[in-house]
């Protein structure tokens, strides 16, 4: 899973990236300090892996990972190549989801590229550039489909679909906000539209606002905007997240408790990203390794096995599965088997989040 972090200059985007990856990306109080995308890989927080590691005491523990890409800042006109527009658009095409950092705090020491703080204007600045880029993509596709229609009537469905999306884009409605039937979903995948990508808005607030984040006026504005386009909002203080990222686990817990928070904003972001992309994890456990594997919800057992190795998918015989909760409750795989909680599943089995599995195969 690859998530692109975007935002106008000086909204806290690079500071947030630093928090996530502890990569120390250059961060300065002026536009375009992020010229090339910084990439960082971060483990998905998962208590189940920690518990299984305690049970098996393996040689190796591997959590699922998310790849975060800090994408260069942009300005109005990016879709026409202004600022770092062309680079921005090429980098954002490569990600699975977008995380847009939006400034929701006042601070006279941190300049704003447009002179004052207005989160909705900032959101619309970026979204408009993505809409303009998609309009260009769709115009080219439409021309091609109209030429194809002369030889084959099947192109009519594509033409109708493109015109449906275009008419909504012209009203400022992104592709992700629309409803699609199965055929349309397949066509949409083939168009690689930027506004079809799932999006999470990070409402970057000050430390003083954190106790009452959901009731802050700017946060409420962002939430109302997001609700109209199937987007998610996470209010967090990027400065606090940066502090948390440098602490040991126990110190981090104590700081979160002192702030009245149950978990860090970054953990929320990773979990929300998983949900937004329809992802989940199955687990493998043994003395050599305890590991989480990321798959799409609805994945069948052989396809999941292919995540581990293509040979296992090709020679799939069956999957020996116990739910994580059952395994932890019984205390061992042997005890779970004695209780009849370990199942033998075939090729049509749809994997569930938290399945602990051993694949049987023959090649």
In which residue ranges do the predicted regions lie?
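Conserved G1/Walker A P-loop phosphate-binding module
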Residues: 1-111, 138-140, 145
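C-terminal-of-GTPase-core extension/linker across diverse P-loop GTPases
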Residues: 2-6, 17, 144-350, 362-363
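Generic anion/oxyanion-binding catalytic loop in active/binding sites
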Residues: 5, 24, 77, 115, ...
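Flexible interhelical turns and helix-capping residues at alpha-helix boundaries
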Residues: 9, 131-134, 192
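Glycine-rich, flexible loop/turn motifs
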Residues: 23-31, 38-40, 48-51, 80, ...
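Amphipathic alpha-helical transducer elements in NTP-driven molecular machines
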Residues: 32, 46-49, 62-68, 82-95, ...
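Conserved Switch II/interswitch segment of TRAFAC-class P-loop GTPases
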Residues: 40-45, 72-82, 93-155, 168-181, ...
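Structural motif
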Residues: 352-357
């Amino acid at each position: 899973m690859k998530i692109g972090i975007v935002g106008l200059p000086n909204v806290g985007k690079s500071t947030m990236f630093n928090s996530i990856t502890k990569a120390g990306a250059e961060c300065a109080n002026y536009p375009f300090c992020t010229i090339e995308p910084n990439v960082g890989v971060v483990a998905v927080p998962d208590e189940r892996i920690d518990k299984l590691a305690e049970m098996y005491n393996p040689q190796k523990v591997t959590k699922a990972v998310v790849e975060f890409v800090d994408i260069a800042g942009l300005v109005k006109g990016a879709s026409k190549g202004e600022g770092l527009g062309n680079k921005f658009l090429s980098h954002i095409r490569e990600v699975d989801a977008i995380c847009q950092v939006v400034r929701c705090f006042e601070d006279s020491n941190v300049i704003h590229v447009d002179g004052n703080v207005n989160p909705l204007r900032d959101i619309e600045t970026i979204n408009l550039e993505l809409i303009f880029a998609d309009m260009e993509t769709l115009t080219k596709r439409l021309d091609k489909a109209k030429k194809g229609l002369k030889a084959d009537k099947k192109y009519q469905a594509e033409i109708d679909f493109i015109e449906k999306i275009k008419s909504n884009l012209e009203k400022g409605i992104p592709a992700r906000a629309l409803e699609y039937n199965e055929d349309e979903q397949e066509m949409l995948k083939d168009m690689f539209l930027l506004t079809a990508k799932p999006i999470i808005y990070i409402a970057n607030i000050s430390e003083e606002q954190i106790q009452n984040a959901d009731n802050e006026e700017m946060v409420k504005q962002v939430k109302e905007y997001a609700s109209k386009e199937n987007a998610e909002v996470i209010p967090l203080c990027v400065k606090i997240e940066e502090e948390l990222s440098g602490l040991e686990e126990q110190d981090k817990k104590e700081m979160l408790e002192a702030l009245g928070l149950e978990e860090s904003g970054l953990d929320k972001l990773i979990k929300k990203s998983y949900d937004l992309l329809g992802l989940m994890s199955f687990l493998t456990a043994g003395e050599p390794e305890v590991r989480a594997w990321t798959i799409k919800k609805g994945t069948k057992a052989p396809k999941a096995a292919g995540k581990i190795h293509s040979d296992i998918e090709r020679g799939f015989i069956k999957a020996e599965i116990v739910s994580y909760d059952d395994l932890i409750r019984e205390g061992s795989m042997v005890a779970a088997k004695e209780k009849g909680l370990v199942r033998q599943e075939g090729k049509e089995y749809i994997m569930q989040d938290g399945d602990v599995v051993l694949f049987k195969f023959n090649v």
